[in-house]
Amino acid sequence: MPKEKPHVNIVFIGHVDHGKSTTIGRLLYDTGNIPETIIKKFEEMGEKGKSFKFAWVMDRLKEERERGITIDVAHTKFETPHRYITIIDAPGHRDFVKNMITGASQADAAVLVVAATDGVMPQTKEHAFLARTLGIKHIIVTINKMDMVNYDQKVFEKVKAQVEKLLKTLGYKDFPVIPTSAWNGDNVVKKSDKMPWYNGPTLIEALDQIPEPEKPIDKPLRIPIQDVYSIKGVGTVPVGRVETGKLKVGDVVIFEPASTIFHKPIQGEVKSIEMHHEPLQEALPGDNIGFNVRGVSKNDIKRGDVAGHTDKPPTVVRTKDTFKAQIIVLNHPTAITVGYSPVLHAHTAQIPVRFEQILAKVDPRTGNIVEENPQFIKTGDSAIVVLRPMKPVVLEPVKEIPQLGRFAIRDMGMTIAAGMVISIQKGE
């Protein structure tokens, strides 16, 4: 049985209007993966005799977007010779950041789209910082709209130098920089004949070489719970995605913060594991599973709890504890000061938190302190802060278990900040 191709999740980032949607559209169009709904519309319009034009497809995708329907994520799967690629999101989406952090899919790589006409813009930087904060290890850069600068190598080299400077200061190494015109199809899927001076990969070739994501099986078991079912004749069945470690039938698992809240261990033996309605003996990172636990009732656990082994239980931050975090403020109408109390979204948990201290403003590129104990922080700032949860929650330092160390901060229906847990301070 040949080994299945690795699945890789990618996100598209970059400044508004630099061509993210067009690039996604071109990838789907040239690989024959345009959403069914659009092909149907084309047929309904009786356009049979006319060629199925890229511009027309982009207009339909734009209409769907404006009606609030982004290209349905389910459609944006395509294959390269060595990879199954899923485009999990693109930042036109209001909940882009929250989805990237709490979504079922952590991105393995990001495609940063930069327009040759503009070069590096504020959002280019912000999205690059964000990719770094979210722990995205691999970046592919496209310098897009090359048709608008007459496919000029000098312009390409100039913008490429700007982007390289930005990404290298963020710690990215060895990333391809590809001159493209998504609108005309140059170097997205098909090699361009307009830029003989470029001999690197096309975008699809670069996507085909994204390193296979490693499965963190050696880390302690962590399964954030999405739902809990009570199934007749079986018992309590929590459902969630294994983030780290492995779960075997017969293991004893404990749930947190449930055990902390009820002041007694909520734990039991795993009697069975199921994935896609098939029984499993062992579940690994990335597996979405249901598992039956002896002696745990449906009322003991809920979404946001995390299952782990009893010898290395999930870390609970209680209301008397605090945690130190590095955050990047993405969108706040005024300024954040001590006492601000928004909602923290981490893995499947959502809990109110309070800003206890703002320790420092930092340079997001180097991590160096720019200002100690600032009075406030605002949109665009990176900072080291101390937060206190208003309800117990499982969080892990990002250096130990990154999957449970990243979070979004939301308020007023929008994502205010993204961050990562540096350390946890236990209160007495």
From Swiss-Prot:
Per UniProt, the enzyme's principal EC class comes to: hydrolase
Its subcellular locations are: Cytoplasm
- Could you tell me which residue ranges the tr-type G domain spans? 5-217
Q: Which amino acid positions bind Mg(2+), per UniProt?
A: 21
PROSITE patterns in alphabetical order: G_TR_1, G_TR_2
Region of interest (G2), residue spans: 68-72
Gene3D superfamilies named in the record? P-loop containing nucleotide triphosphate hydrolases (3.40.50.300), Translation factors (2.40.30.10)
Region annotation G3: residue ranges? 89-92
UniProt EC number: 3.6.5.3
Q: Which InterPro entries match?
A: EFTu-like_2, G_TR_CS, GTP-eEF1A_C, P-loop_NTPase, Small_GTP-bd, T_Tr_GTP-bd_dom, TRAFAC_GTPase_members, Transl_B-barrel_sf
Any idea which GO molecular function terms this record carries? GTP binding; GTPase activity; translation elongation factor activity
- Pfam families tied to this protein: GTP-eEF1A_C, GTP_EFTU, GTP_EFTU_D2
Q: Where is this region: G4?
A: 144-147
The record describes the protein's role as:
GTP hydrolase that promotes the GTP-dependent binding of aminoacyl-tRNA to the A-site of ribosomes during protein biosynthesis.
**How is this protein named in the record?**
Elongation factor 1-alpha
According to its UniProt entry, this protein's organism is Pyrococcus horikoshii (strain ATCC 700860 / DSM 12428 / JCM 9974 / NBRC 100139 / OT-3)
